[in-house]
């Protein structure tokens, strides 16, 4: 392992050495650019574009273009990128991740590769985690690009399609990750090409790249429509599970007895009924066998009610506001407005909390961030913390993490963790340190991992009469303003995880002399990266700073993975004193090994998500490509329609005429022809079922289809109307079947794990079953297109 790390470190150094040489070239242009007038500097943009047209590559232009962008920054923004920012810019242009510490000027770093890549005219997307940051950066950095002659757009969720189209047509477009993904999905649901808003995906720079490509990687973007659902079923299941008792016996216990009705496996957060629980369900609902096929829906409702009541925690996983259940992002602590837990879990939580149950929705289109961002020609990103996830970035996104040196040395003091026996003793110690530091005026930022913890601490500080600001999912609208003031003398700020990320904390007057910003973590996060982000809020640009984490044996991470070893160690040292504190390297090592295990589990889960989603990705690409072919067509879709109808005829005739003639299913064949292709009169007068051969019948039906097509063309004198009719037929059928297929694939994925018990590989089973279901769907699409086209009545009123 040490050798691998050494190799990676050396590779990093080698890459930086190469970048240093390019940075030398950029700096060699500095005086030349400074000597140019504003008009001459601005004229460089059309000059570069002309050189690209003549065959120069962006790499050829890099030193000069970076120098132009740098000089323009000085004149327009009053900011001149440092050498380390040039290095970061080169890493971004190369499609890598620039790991730059907080306060090192990532936003300014991005201006150079954005300018260079925008010269191609193919569009650059600058991606941020929320609309506040998109809007802020578009306003501040947009003036630089506009001065240099580029067009700049902002894409937000409230825009009309026309406004979005204009934003995407710009050289530089600022947007959130979710809006980009949703626009892509919506573009693949339109009926007319001119309704689309995005151009082909060229180059993206993702700010806070770890947050988007790692933390949110498993979050699918979903566009839904309402599905029918009986809400009473959720209430019935909820009432039943509320009566159940947990089986807390050891999983490895030898006895075969149940000690409760349901069992929870906390490391995987799974919950299931015991045999006693299953029997109780049968008695409660009057069933012989809970797991009979006809009880499938009830089992689903019970499973979700169990999760809602015993796994999902209020004010940690979700909040209830104004009679509505809102999801809390476990990484940022923010409320995720408009998002709902899928597969009926949200409805189950609504039943649990006694609020109005909203309709369950049906997925119409879906994609994960992993697969959306992998479609860009070139992808890059910036963050203060990516090195711990380097393997994942390389394997999944083919991006290297390049650690960019700081402009000034880091002098922040990172103190060892302190461990307490209980939550109460830990929070008491945190408040004591806050009191001590607040008394001398030092600003303090306290990081918590849940809304519950932040409110508990806030209540304790109120009792001590210490004024403070609370930043969590319940008031994130003001978070940027609050976080900007967190470095002022006497400020005390409590933040859930990385609320306010992307906004710098600058130190107020006299704060350096007090030791800079003090950061106190009240719990270790399951990811080292999130802890590092919290530490990184302090000690920016060579400022002094202080960080310390407070832990307790009752913390979630310690309970799940800390193990009895730490507890025994603490018991030996603490003499049953709840206020006893331990500061030991063993504790830090134990915590870090627990974090590594969780990170490993999470990476495996994300990798598995990608493997499963790749099955859907291939299918999605086929369907979207077919849709685009239909939408793109300007003349006639006959060349698409006819093969579909011919394949349907072949399939049906072959199916009903298998084996010996005496076994042919002629009634079924006649039913197919009457229901899908021709009138009864035609069938009775034109087809002789006693003497026909399958091949001759196929040819006869092909001719029938051709005649029908020509009749419809004649009825619709305008070719544009015929094209319109063809598009409506194909797209309506494709979209309906695709929506149902997404739902079926989702259900397949939920159930596929059970096949693992039969010594089968669930992924291979999912791939095989998914492929068969897709083939079946294509066949169903062609069948329905055949019937709809042949049986549709033309009324000559088709218009766009």
From Swiss-Prot:
Recorded hits in Pfam families, A to Z, give:
P-loop_SecA (PF21090), SecA_DEAD (PF07517), SecA_PP_bind (PF01043), SecA_SW (PF07516)
Q: Which Gene Ontology cellular component terms are annotated?
A: cell envelope Sec protein transport complex; cytosol; plasma membrane
Compartments it resides in: Cell membrane; Cytoplasm
User: Where is ATP bound in this sequence?
Assistant: 85, 103-107, 504
Checking InterPro entries in the record gives:
Helicase_ATP-bd, Helicase_C-like, P-loop_NTPase, SecA, SecA_CS, SecA_DEAD, SecA_motor_DEAD, SecA_preprotein_X-link_dom
Chief place of localization: membrane
Q: What class of enzyme is it?
A: translocase
Q: Which GO terms describe its molecular function?
A: ATP binding; protein-exporting ATPase activity
Q: Which reaction does it catalyse?
A: ATP + H2O + cellular proteinSide 1 = ADP + phosphate + cellular proteinSide 2
Keyword Iron on entry: no
The entry's function note states: Part of the Sec protein translocase complex. Interacts with the SecYEG preprotein conducting channel. Has a central role in coupling the hydrolysis of ATP to the transfer of proteins into and across the cell membrane, serving as an ATP-driven molecular motor driving the stepwise translocation of polypeptide chains across the membrane.
**Protein name per the record:** Protein translocase subunit SecA
Organism name = Lactobacillus delbrueckii subsp. bulgaricus (strain ATCC 11842 / DSM 20081 / BCRC 10696 / JCM 1002 / NBRC 13953 / NCIMB 11778 / NCTC 12712 / WDCM 00102 / Lb 14)
């Amino acid at each position: 392992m040490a050798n691998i790390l050494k190799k990676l470190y050396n590779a990093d150094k080698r890459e930086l050495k190469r970048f240093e040489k390019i940075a030398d070239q950029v700096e060699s242009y500095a005086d030349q650019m400074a000597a140019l007038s504003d008009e001459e500097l601005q004229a460089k943009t059309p000059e570069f574009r002309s050189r690209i047209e003549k065959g120069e590559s962006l790499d050829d232009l890099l030193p000069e273009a970076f120098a132009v962008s740098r000089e323009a920054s000085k004149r327009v923004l009053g900011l001149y990128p440092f050498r380390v920012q040039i290095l970061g810019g080169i890493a971004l242009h190369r499609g890598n991740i620039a790991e730059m510490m907080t306060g090192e000027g990532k936003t300014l770093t991005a201006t150079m590769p954005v300018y260079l890549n925008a010269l191609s005219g193919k569009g650059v997307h600058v991606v941020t985690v929320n609309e506040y940051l998109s809007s802020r950066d578009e306003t501040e950095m947009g003036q630089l690009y506009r001065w240099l002659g580029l067009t700049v757009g902002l894409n937000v969720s409230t825009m009309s399609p026309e406004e979005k189209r204009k934003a995407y047509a710009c050289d530089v477009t600022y947007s959130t990750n979710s809006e980009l993904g949703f626009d892509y999905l919506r573009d693949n649901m339109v009926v007319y090409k001119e309704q689309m808003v995005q151009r082909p995906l060229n180059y993206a720079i993702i700010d806070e790249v770890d947050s988007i490509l790692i933390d949110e990687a498993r979050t699918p973007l979903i566009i839904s429509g309402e599905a029918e659902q009986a809400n009473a079923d959720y209430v019935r299941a909820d009432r039943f599970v509320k009566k159940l008792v947990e089986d807390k016996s050891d999983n490895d216990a030898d006895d075969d007895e149940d000690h409760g009705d349901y069992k929870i496996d906390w490391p995987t957060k799974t919950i299931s009924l015991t045999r006693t629980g299953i029997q109780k369900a049968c008695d409660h609902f009057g069933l012989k066998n809970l797991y009979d096929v006809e009880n499938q829906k009830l089992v689903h409702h019970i499973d979700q009610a169990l999760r809602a009541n015993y796994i999902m925690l209020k004010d940690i996983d979700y909040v209830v506001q104004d009679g509505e259940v809102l999801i809390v992002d476990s990484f940022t602590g923010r409320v995720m407005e408009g998002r709902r837990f899928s597969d009926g879990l949200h409805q189950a939580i609504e039943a649990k909390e006694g609020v109005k149950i909203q309709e369950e929705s049906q997925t119409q289109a879906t994609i994960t961030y992993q697969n959306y961002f992998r479609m860009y020609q070139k992808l890059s990103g910036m963050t203060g913390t990516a090195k711990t996830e380097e393997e994942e970035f390389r394997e999944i996104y083919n991006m290297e993490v390049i650690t960019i040196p700081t402009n000034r040395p880091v002098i922040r003091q990172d103190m060892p963790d302190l461990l307490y026996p209980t939550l109460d003793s830990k929070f008491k110690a945190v408040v004591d340190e806050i009191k001590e530091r607040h008394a001398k005026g030092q600003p303090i930022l306290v990081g918590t991992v849940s809304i519950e913890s932040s409110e508990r601490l806030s209540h304790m500080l109120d009792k001590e009469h210490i004024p403070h600001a609370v930043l969590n999912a319940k008031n994130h609208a003001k978070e940027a303003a609050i976080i900007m003031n967190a470095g002022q003398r006497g400020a005390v700020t409590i933040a859930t995880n990385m609320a306010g990320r992307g906004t710098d904390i600058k130190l107020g007057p006299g704060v350096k002399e007090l030791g800079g910003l003090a950061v106190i973590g009240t719990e270790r996060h399951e990811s080292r990266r999130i802890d590092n982000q919290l530490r990184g809020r302090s000690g920016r640009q060579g400022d002094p700073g202080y960080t310390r984490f407070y832990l307790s044996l009752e913390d979630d991470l310690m309970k799940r993975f800390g193990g009895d070893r730490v507890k025994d160690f603490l018991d030996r040292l603490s003499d049953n004193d709840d206020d006893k504190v331990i500061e030991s390297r063993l504790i830090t090592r134990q915590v870090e090994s627990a974090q590594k295990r969780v990170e490993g589990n999470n990476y495996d889960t994300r990798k598995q998500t990608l493997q499963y989603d790749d099955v859907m990705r291939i299918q999605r690409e086929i369907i979207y490509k077919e849709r685009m072919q239909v939408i793109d067509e300007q003349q006639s879709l006959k060349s698409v329609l006819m093969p579909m109808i011919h394949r349907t005829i072949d399939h049906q005739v072959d199916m009903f005429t298998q084996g010996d003639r005496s076994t042919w299913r002629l009634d079924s064949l006649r039913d197919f022809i009457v229901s899908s292709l021709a009138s009864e009169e035609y069938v009775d007068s034109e087809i002789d079922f006693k003497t026909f051969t399958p091949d001759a019948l196929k040819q006869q039906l092909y001719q029938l289809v051709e005649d029908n097509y020509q009749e419809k063309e004649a009825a619709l004198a305008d070719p544009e109307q015929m094209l319109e009719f063809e598009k409506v037929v194909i797209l309506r059928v494709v979209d309906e079947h695709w929506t149902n297929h997404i739902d079926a694939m989702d259900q397949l994925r939920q159930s596929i794990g059970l096949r693992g018990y039969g010594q089968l590989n669930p992924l291979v089973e999912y791939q095989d079953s998914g492929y068969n279901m897709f083939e079946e769907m294509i066949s169903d699409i062609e069948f329905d297109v055949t019937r709809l086209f042949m049986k549709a009545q033309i009324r000559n009123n088709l218009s766009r």
